[in-house]
């Protein structure tokens, strides 16, 4: 197959305005192509979200490609140089919402699978795709429920490649072999509302909160490790008061987030926060939300297969990294021992005029195909 096979498919996907959670039949298009080469396709839908599980083969090892057909909203369309849902070739790039995140990865893997199956129709092991329309949104009815279903069935995943756009300066320079965890908190500090001229008759929760926050932001939570940077604590929102300048507020709210490494656990972080707040004598309510645990795939069969494929195709020695935000890899890592993320350059993801370099489509497809060969055909 030629590079145009990937280009044609990604154009067809971009033309479908699949803003979370609407799939707009992207997965139906993928299933039709996959069924033609022997994949058994199943739709798992819940809460307005569409998920596709497609598998070819019954033996081990099972190599999975995971991705999402949903995209973020395009934002003001008048800021785009072309319609975000009309795929447009211009100056060596393909423009459109989802071009980089992550419809090109999906198209490249589907074509890679077609080429691989055509060359090796009796290949050992199994290939599967796990595609959701709920990655950019709440992510509660997407990959996580498919993983739960696969666990209940006893399906054993061995390797998973998540097609997130991980490259930075050039295709293949960075892969993600892990991600930090995310832990958020909503802290409500209770005070006593009153007149600013009579502070002795009030209790200002902002004044009480400020020194506690100052201490929290100065803490070194851990030192990280060889795979992860140190855990970070960031305050994202502060709110107090009525808008009037002569009223002491009755309560103050702070929202904060940890991005944490495997050097700390959620329970350890929570305990240290509570210790600080209690020591400062605050009357408070603290609600926690664990967005995801950190995961890590040490060097092994999957990292070697992908890094080797990248080097063979591009000449680059890919860096293994754990930086960045969370992804659906956090759900897959619960049922799959080796998970890695790899895809095109991410400089324009979620931005106006999102784009991918046209010349990267064929190499991306070839890297995915070579990785399948390295994993499934190795002696």
From Swiss-Prot:
Sorted UniProt keywords: Amino-acid biosynthesis, Cobalt, Diaminopimelate biosynthesis, Hydrolase, Lysine biosynthesis, Metal-binding, Zinc
Free-text remark on how the cofactor is bound: Binds 2 Zn(2+) or Co(2+) ions per subunit.
Cross-referenced Gene3D superfamilies: 1.10.150.900, 3.30.70.360, Zn peptidases (3.40.630.10)
Residues where Zn(2+) 2 binds: 101, 136, 350
Family: Belongs to the peptidase M20A family. DapE subfamily.
Pathway: Amino-acid biosynthesis; L-lysine biosynthesis via DAP pathway; LL-2,6-diaminopimelate from (S)-tetrahydrodipicolinate (succinylase route): step 3/3
Source species of the chain: Bordetella parapertussis (strain 12822 / ATCC BAA-587 / NCTC 13253)
Cofactor(s) the protein needs: Zn(2+); Co(2+)
Enzyme class, spelled out: hydrolase
Residues at the active site: 70, 135
Catalytic reaction equation(s): N-succinyl-(2S,6S)-2,6-diaminopimelate + H2O = (2S,6S)-2,6-diaminopimelate + succinate
Molecular functions (GO terms): acetylornithine deacetylase activity; cobalt ion binding; succinyl-diaminopimelate desuccinylase activity; zinc ion binding
Binding-site positions, Zn(2+) 1: 68, 101, 164
InterPro entries in the cross-refs: Bact_exopeptidase_dim_dom, DapE_proteobac, Peptidase_M20, Peptidase_M20_dimer, Peptidase_M20A
Record function comment: Catalyzes the hydrolysis of N-succinyl-L,L-diaminopimelic acid (SDAP), forming succinate and LL-2,6-diaminopimelate (DAP), an intermediate involved in the bacterial biosynthesis of lysine and meso-diaminopimelic acid, an essential component of bacterial cell walls.
Subunit structure, interactors included: Homodimer.
Annotated PANTHER family: ACETYLORNITHINE DEACETYLASE (PTHR43808), N-ACETYL-L-CITRULLINE DEACETYLASE (PTHR43808:SF31)
GO biological process: diaminopimelate biosynthetic process; L-arginine biosynthetic process; lysine biosynthetic process via diaminopimelate
EC number: 3.5.1.18
Name of the protein in its database record: Succinyl-diaminopimelate desuccinylase
């Amino acid at each position: 197959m030629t590079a145009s096979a990937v280009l044609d498919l990604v154009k067809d996907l971009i033309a479908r305005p699949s803003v979370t959670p609407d799939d707009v039949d992207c997965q139906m298009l993928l299933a039709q192509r996959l069924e033609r080469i022997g994949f058994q396709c199943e739709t798992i839908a819940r809460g307005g979200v569409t998920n596709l599980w497609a598998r070819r083969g019954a033996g081990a090892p099972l190599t999975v490609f995971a991705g999402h057909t949903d995209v973020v909203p395009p934002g003001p369309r008048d800021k785009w140089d072309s319609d975000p849902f009309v795929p447009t070739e211009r100056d060596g790039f393909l423009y459109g919402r989802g071009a980089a995140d992550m419809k090109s990865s999906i198209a490249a893997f589907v074509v890679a699978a077609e080429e691989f199956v055509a060359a090796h129709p009796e290949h050992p092991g199994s290939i599967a795709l796990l595609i959701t329309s709920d990655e950019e949104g709440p992510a509660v009815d997407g990959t996580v429920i498919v993983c739960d279903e696969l666990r209940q069935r006893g399906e054993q995943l061995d390797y998973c490649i998540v097609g997130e756009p991980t490259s930075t300066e050039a295709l293949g320079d960075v892969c993600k072999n892990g991600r930090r965890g995310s832990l958020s908190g909503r802290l409500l500090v209770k005070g006593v509302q009153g007149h600013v001229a009579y502070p002795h008759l009030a209790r200002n929760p902002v004044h009480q909160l400020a020194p506690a926050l100052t201490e929290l932001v100065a803490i070194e939570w851990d030192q990280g490790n060889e795979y992860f940077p140190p855990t970070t604590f960031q305050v994202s929102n502060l709110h107090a008061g009525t808008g009037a300048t002569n009223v002491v507020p009755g309560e103050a709210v702070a929202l904060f987030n940890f991005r944490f490494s495997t050097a700390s656990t959620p329970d350890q972080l929570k305990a240290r926060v509570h210790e600080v707040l209690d020591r400062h004598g605050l009357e408070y309510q603290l609600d926690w939300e664990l967005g995801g645990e950190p995961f890590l795939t040490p060097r092994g069969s999957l990292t070697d297969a992908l890094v080797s494929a990248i080097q063979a195709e591009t000449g680059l020695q890919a860096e293994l990294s754990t930086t960045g935000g969370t992804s659906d890899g956090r759900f897959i890592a619960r049922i799959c021992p080796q998970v890695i993320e790899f895809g095109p350059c991410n400089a324009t993801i979620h931005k106006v005029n999102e784009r991918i370099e046209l010349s990267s489509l064929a190499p991306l497809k070839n890297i995915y195909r070579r990785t399948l060969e390295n994993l499934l055909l190795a002696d």
